[in-house]
């Protein structure tokens, strides 16, 4: 049975709904104020990893490296660290036989938008990672996208069109977590 959020009487965040992930540059909401306090005044993590939805059509996930050109205002260690961790993720996916993870020009993500959780981390000399993964509790189909059927530099291990289940998305996220650790 298809699930629906139509019966929910209100947004799950009173003022910004799902856009609270875009509030990190301004910190106008209680959630982002608290996260910024923890990230930049208390914990000082070396890596900030944001799991997000949804992946590009014809793939399962987008994972770093991000597309060029890189934002030149960051210390060179930031994009180098992002690229190294991204390479570790992609190597682990290949080793585990998990197909359909794209990078760089496989999607629109870059280091130039500075309002989100992973991008504000760059200004604190922290490596910010973002993955965008398909899937929800309702099974969905990976569509046939002709240009995503053959391996490329940005999609070295393509995935065939198929039915996709949320558990598979969780398994991909776990692979990324282990690669980062």
Task: State the predicted function of each range.
Residues 1-181:
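Structured catalytic-domain cores with a bias toward divalent-metal coordination
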């Amino acid at each position: 049975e298809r699930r629906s959020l139509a019966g929910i009487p209100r947004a799950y965040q009173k003022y910004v709904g799902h856009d609270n992930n875009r509030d990190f540059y301004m910190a106008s909401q209680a959630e982002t104020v608290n996260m910024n306090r923890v990230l930049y005044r208390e914990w000082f993590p070396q890596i900030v990893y944001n799991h997000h939805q949804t992946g590009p059509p014809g793939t399962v996930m987008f994972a770093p490296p991000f597309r060029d050109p890189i934002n030149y205002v960051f210390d060179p260690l930031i994009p180098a660290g992002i690229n190294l961790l991204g390479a570790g993720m992609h190597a682990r996916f290949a080793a585990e036989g998990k197909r359909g993870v794209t990078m760089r020009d496989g999607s629109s993500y870059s280091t130039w938008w500075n309002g989100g959780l992973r991008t504000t981390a760059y200004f604190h000399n922290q490596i910010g990672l973002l993955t965008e993964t398909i899937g929800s509790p309702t099974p969905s189909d990976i569509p046939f996208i002709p240009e995503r059927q053959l391996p490329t530099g940005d999609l070295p291990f393509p995935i065939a069109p198929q039915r996709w289940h949320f558990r598979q998305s969780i398994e991909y996220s776990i692979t990324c977590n282990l690669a980062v650790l």
